[in-house]
Amino acid sequence: MFTKILKKFFSSYEKLKDNEDENEPSSNSTNNFYKTCPEDNSSKWSKISFNWVTKLIMKGYLKESLEMNDIYDLPELNKVQTTSKLLEDIDLSNNSNYTLIKHIYKKFLPKNKYALVSNLFIIIFTFLSPICLKFLINYISIQDENEKSILKGILLCCLLCLCVLGQSISQELFYWFGIKNGFDVRGALAAKIFEKTLKLSNASRKEYKSGKIMNIMSIDVANISEYFWTHHINIVSHFIQILSLVGLLCYVVGPSGLVGFGVMVIALPINAMLCAKSSNYLEKSLEYSDSRTNLTSELITNIRPFKMYAWENFFINKIDGQRKQELKNIFLRIFYSILDHMMIETNATLVLVSTFATYSLNGNTMSLDVTFTAMTIFSKLEVPLIRLPYDIFKAIGLIPSVKRVQNFLKSSESLKYNKNFKNENQKITTTKENNNQHGQDNDIIVENCTFQWNEPENNNIFELNYGDNEEEENQDESINKKENDNEEFNYKLKDINLIVPKGKLTMICGVVGSGKTSLIFGLIGEIYKLNGSVSGVPNNISFTSQQPFLLSASLRENILFGNEFDIERYKKVIESTALTKDIVNLAGLDLTEIGERGINLSGGQKQRISLARALYANSDCFIFDEPLSAVDPEVASHLFDHCIQGELMRNKTRILVTHQLQFIPYADHIIVLNSNGQLIQGTYQELNEKGIDFKSILKTKEIKKNVENETDSEELIKNEIEIENEIIDVNNAISDKNDPNLIEKAKLLVKEDKNEGEVEFNVYKKYFSYGSSGVTLFITISLFFVGQAIFKVSDFWLTIWTERSIEGKSDSFYIGYYLLIFGTFVVILMIRILLLCRITFNVGKNLHSALLKSVTYASCRFFDTNPSGRILNRFSKDTSDIDIHMFDILTEVSMCFSELTIGLISIVFIIPIMVIPLIILSIAYYILQRLYRPSARELNRWESITVSPIFSLLQECYNGLLTIRTYKQESRFIKEMFDNININLGCFFYSFAVHRWVSMRLEVMGWIMVFFTSLIATLFISNNGLAALSVTTALSLNGYLSWGIRRIVDLEVKMNSFQRIQSYIEIPKEGNKLVSTNSNEVDNHTIKDADLVNWPNKGIIEFKNVEIKYRPNSEPNLKDLSFKVQSSEKIGIVGRTGAGKTTIASSLFRMVECSKGLILIDGIDISKVQLQKLRSSIGIVPQDPFIFTGTIRSNIDPFNEFTDFEIWESVEKVKLKDAINSMPLKLETALQENGDNGFSYGQKQLLCLCRTILKNFKIILMDEATSSIDYHTAQLIKQTIQENFKDCTTLTIAHRLETIIDCNKIAVIDSGQLIEFDTPSNLMNIPNSKFNKLIKSQTDYNNNEKTIINK
């Protein structure tokens, strides 16, 4: 009822305010904020009282929620675009570990002038308060009522309360100005880290994985920015307060005060040691946190292959190992923090006891004014005494974070960001005319270059390599010497000399692992060049990698890639890349969201979108790294004729890396690399004359090229792609952005859930259920109240001591009992903190374990609809909140409310009439917290949610660094990141503004409480001792009012992190659980593993009317699919790219469940087989090769099931023995994520094949297993497969028809349907069969036909 009245009242107020603000100017910001910050145009009084925040408070209260468009824009001075400029001129070239922190002090401290002034007033009022209290207690102590002037008493009360109010206002303004400064540091550092991420070299990326960078941006930047809130000023301020208050103490109690000060000084080194220990364990915990986050990121990014290999448990155990070490160091950090806290509490009392004992033993009388003034001074001293070690701890804890950020900012960058590299590429070599290669102007010329992936020992390579020829010769000798001395220098390419003619098509080919990708990376400055020169490389380059980089955005946005939309060019690009049919089949046409890394597209579709992006960019130079291997022959021919050789690229410089040698004769220039990295170059005719027999390589008599009489492309017979483009109008592929139905269909990513309203009791109950029983929790909470009650007894005992209430007792009696009371308090304090530590530690441990298992066992649909950055946010920031912050917050909330409760009871016990003002204040307190909490809670929730886009973009850009840099799109992504950071900082900014709003009002309420208590005690309480005690108690409670409500909201905020984690723990699991918490817990419809011991033993596969949908309301990807595979049969699956071939593989592994129909293996419905059993029973060589962080051995045999001999035998079968033997540590060589530091793309495919050969599977599925391998190696691997898999049922998905030509049967898939299924010979005998056309479209037609006839 009371709440309804409040809402009705404030609703009227809100309408009045809306009328006043109708003409309020709107912001031009492009983000979701819609109004300028009210602080900019507010009066001085409004700024001091924070009245400018009131409207936002009212909105949150009346709506019980806040949306993004309710939040004001960030002030221009605090936006990242402004603050990041302060770090632009930082010089990190020296070896000092403190360069960054010095620069921050230099640039940001001048902005803190208002905070410094506010802090000065805090010091002044802190010093004056005890003096005013001394005068007031002196007045109270006057025994003769006739000597007391009521007016004087009132004036003394007002003077005391004025000091209290002045200190409170100064404190709030100090926090506000200080936090704004730290806030600026946070934004500037986050911006700098992202800018650096976009420049990282390949060598730096080995050390700095995306997970580690996320931790640096979230945890380390937060540590640094929090230090610059107030701690950097408080270190000096608190020291000054301690000295001034100790001086005042000496004034009150004489030299006895120095004894207490001495005790305090003696304890400080112990505090410092404990702080250092705690900081040391914090640094270690951050290292393990980095490792854990990196592994988690790897798991989430590669979740599909992990599931297909049934390796979830293996990687969960790997992550758990890092988590255990992280938790161990977190516990030790908290333990030493507890000891430090105990020392502070003990020290504060020992200082008081030693001072009073010395004062009494020296013959002085303990009077009220001395006792309670000293108590107040000690109370005032307690704050800097507690906070100074904490400030020092923050400063010490800052060091590892500063080092981590600084080391990251100092890490090596891609060479293209070096001005020497830029200058070199912009000039043509002056000695070109003396070179026997005779390059023309604007040709790309590489002279005497040595390229390597790893960072050289002397990473200032430009100073080494630029100069005259004599210096270069000396450099060559130096390099060769180093190579002999250090086996870690593994040069992939040495002494490279080549020309890429301008405006021509240059093809690069060679055996797998010969260095083709390394060569093009060297051209664009992505690997290290130790000597020689590269010139003529255009500034404007389009690039496609073997693993296409796709944004989590619409298909159109991926093609445009930041360029303006030109509809005519866009249409031509879609037709040239054969995307028309694919786009028309998508639910939202070209506006369809394609998911992170193109997760809902086939490999061929992803490659064609990457090609379309390159084509649309209209660059001067195009570099394609094996784009044609991912598509079928028909599409490959179309892409070559209409894209690579088409009108949009005509007369442009094109470099094509390919194993598709049927296109070699059409090249203007050819570069052939052998296995030693040596190259031969020339035209097709010149290379034939040099002995390069392409005819023997291609195994065909049909390959010819007559340069003078090249066949005109317009005379070629139209293939099916061209017919499709004529039938399907390209306009049908372009969607209307204003069509709401289409936009809804186009969406893939789900909106991140935001909790609404108050945190319910059940949420707290659920949280504590992870950490303890109800009994343990009850005991812990009770001990907080019991402890504070005992502590309050010690204050009453001081009053008894002062008044000598017990006759005939000496000072030692009072001191003894005082120490006994305090000793009891210390014991209870230790027990309650250790119990709470144990509870929060167990919560963190159990919660992360549950989260990891839940996410790992979630369906693939979950990963399709949630970007990896959003998921990782649960494992980084949210987990950090639970691990680190919850213990501190719960401790402070418990202490605050137990202190408030016991303190208020004490005041009412002494002054019963105080019940009336306290009831009035309680009502006001209730109203304030009701107004404040909704806005504070919602702003903090938005702050948590708006972190996810930052992490998602960081993860995405990290994965696509090469593409982003090559297309020179850094500025676009920096702008997007700056907008994301500003949105997040905006929530953070107004969250603190709301805190200050309520704190200011609560401080005023506290001032009112102090005023009434001191006034009533002064005028109406006859017992002078109790009167003095009530005043000092009211003074001590003043800060608890605002502190308590702020910490309550902080608790709700951290509970929001818990709720976000809990929501992921409760997500549906895929199919039948892989691992149950109870091993006997099996679905009633699931077949137990015990009944499938030897399954499958025949390998018979049957699809019965199978229908597969990736989205509930989308068109089926497989339609009414039915076929049967007999035991040991070899089935080849072919079809146009995007036809549904890989979906067949996914359905066999139940990566996506059948919406209709059945899949049977040896007569058993696989939907009733537990996923762990199903997936571990089928071998897979995936379309995208999968290498995880670890050794070569662990990648081949993660469970240590095989001997060295067996592993080497399988390695030799896949032709990787020489490559692995050339590595320093052989099988123990460490590979980074994706294996980029050790293997080429083709070699990674062979490594995946090695895993499958090693295990004895009855059913094996190969999805484009040799697509990126040269023809010769592919033939050897084909023979290996035939020998090792002869007794296995094999399904082979391939675009190279020679790969599947020996299969027993061929399944031809088109648009998700099985259109042909028969033996190769039978299908060849049908003139118009799809398979017949595919065979004839291949270069190796005669050889394939002969193979079929022989069979």
UniProtKB/Swiss-Prot annotation:
Pfam families: ABC_membrane, ABC_tran. Residues 112-397, 777-1060 form the ABC transmembrane type-1 domain. Disulfide bonds: none annotated. Its main location: membrane. ATP binds at residues 510-517, 1135-1142. Residues 474-700, 1101-1336 form the ABC transporter domain. One of its GO terms (molecular function) is ATP hydrolysis activity. It is a multi-pass membrane protein. It is found in: Membrane. Residues 701-734 form a coiled coil. One of its GO terms (cellular component) is membrane. The keyword Coiled coil applies. CDD domains: ABC_6TM_ABCC_D1, ABC_6TM_ABCC_D2, ABCC_MRP_domain1, ABCC_MRP_domain2. Keywords: ATP-binding, Coiled coil, Membrane, Nucleotide-binding, Repeat, Transmembrane, Transmembrane helix, Transport. Gene3D superfamilies: ABC transporter type 1, transmembrane domain, P-loop containing nucleotide triphosphate hydrolases. InterPro entries: AAA+_ATPase (IPR003593), ABC1_TM_dom (IPR011527), ABC1_TM_sf (IPR036640), ABC_transporter-like_ATP-bd (IPR003439), ABC_transporter-like_CS (IPR017871), ABC_transporter_C-like (IPR050173), ABCC_6TM_D1 (IPR044746), ABCC_6TM_D2 (IPR044726). The chain crosses the membrane at residues 120-140, 149-169, 248-268, 771-791, 815-835, 904-924, 977-999, 1002-1022, 1025-1045. GO terms for biological process: culmination involved in sorocarp development; response to cadmium ion; transmembrane transport. Belongs to the ABC transporter superfamily. ABCC family. Conjugate transporter (TC 3.A.1.208) subfamily. This is ABC transporter C family member 6. The gene is abcC6.
